[in-house]
Design a protein with these regions (language model features):
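Short beta-strand-centered segments at strand-helix junctions
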Residues: 29-41
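Short active-site loop/helix that positions an aromatic residue
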Residues: 45
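Long, compositionally biased stretches
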Residues: 1-27, 49-60
């Protein structure tokens, strides 16, 4: 199974940026909240939105 998820910047902590998963009406979130290193985001251009692909089993 493969899921491609979109996350939006929510807030910051001291060393991380918090992203919230874009919600689909009527479906539970796959991940929900994700913390990403500020250093990595600085190198990536500080995006407001990130996309994550999750794969399981033979799809990985």
């Amino acid at each position: 199974m493969i899921a491609t998820l979109t996350f939006w910047r929510s807030r910051q902590t001291r060393n991380k940026v918090v992203f919230e998963e874009e919600r689909t009406r009527g479906k539970a979130p796959v991940i929900g909240t994700m913390y990403v290193s500020k250093d990595w985001l600085d190198a990536a251009g500080n995006p407001e939105e990130i996309t994550v692909t999750v794969a399981t089993g033979d799809d990985a």
